[in-house]
Amino acid sequence: MIRTFAWLLPVLLSIASASAQQDRDNIKIRFTAQTRPADLGELVMVTEDRRSQAFNLPVNHLTEPQTAPGRLFRLEAERQALPLAQVRLPETGDDFVVLLVSGDDSPYEAVVIPYRGDGFRPGDYYLHNVSSLPVLGSVGATEFVIAPRSGRVVRPSGARDERFYDVLLGVREGNASRAISQSRWPVASHTRTYVFFFDDPVRRDVGFRAVDEFVPEEDP
């Protein structure tokens, strides 16, 4: 029995190692950023023993799927070897979106969202608040409040004529609230939208901007 176990142990370890390697090779990430310096250059994902292909970081769309070197890695500027963010992926799942928002203790903070699943569907909005004030509002009949440095999925309802939503965005200052935008957003059944709220130094107010992601019909 002992001899059998001694022979079997290396085989099991080899299988486990191969499985872990396959897991790492199968993890895909799409990136976008709230903002980026003009001279940032290409980025790489780095672990102790692996390094990804370099890629450009967009701010108006998502990257093509990038192969992650593991579930825990550093994001660096390739040209300067400058650490930008630490990224920790969930233990399960192999397809993610990573939003890079302005960090407190590092240039970026990574916000990880599963790419597939019922939690974030076509037609939904993911709102992330990097500003110093709570953000509140409504998309159609769906209301929301988002604390600073947090985010949530908003599933809109109550479209007008099935074509657009009345959208009201505002901030809370102390016990009072005030509007920062009133507009209409179109109903988009094949698009998911990421909305960043941030402190705008030019306007000296909370600003926001959106990144749309087209989701093909075969994707959930």
What are these regions, as identified by a protein language model?
Residues 6-15:
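Bacterial N-terminal signal peptides
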